[in-house]
Amino acid sequence: MVKLRLKRCGRKQQAIYRIVAIDVRSRREGRDLRKVGFYDPIKNQTCLNVPAILYFLEKGAQPTRTVYDILRKAEFFKDKERTLS
């Protein structure tokens, strides 16, 4: 199963996160299938590759709670109301 989740990058005390599609059995820093964006909580910046995210969601990838919140804040789910289990 594939998940969209955060992968930590950056320096100590200055973390930035890549949003990646990754196999659920992989470590947080493990090899990802594809990078689909990044999130910088310090500068509050987000960059999303929308076609890639749509591709993985259509194939059945599940976003983690944090990635779902980032996508919702970026108004990725405009009309669709989605619940996570």
From Swiss-Prot:
Which molecular-function annotations from GO does this UniProt entry contain?
structural constituent of ribosome
Name one matching Pfam family.
Answer: Ribosomal_S16
Q: Does the keyword Ribonucleoprotein apply?
A: yes
One GO term of the biological process aspect: mitochondrial translation
Q: Which HAMAP family match?
A: Ribosomal_bS16
Q: Which family does it belong to?
A: Belongs to the bacterial ribosomal protein bS16 family.
Protein name in the entry: Small ribosomal subunit protein bS16c
Species assigned in the record: Saccharum officinarum
Q: Which gene encodes it?
A: rps16
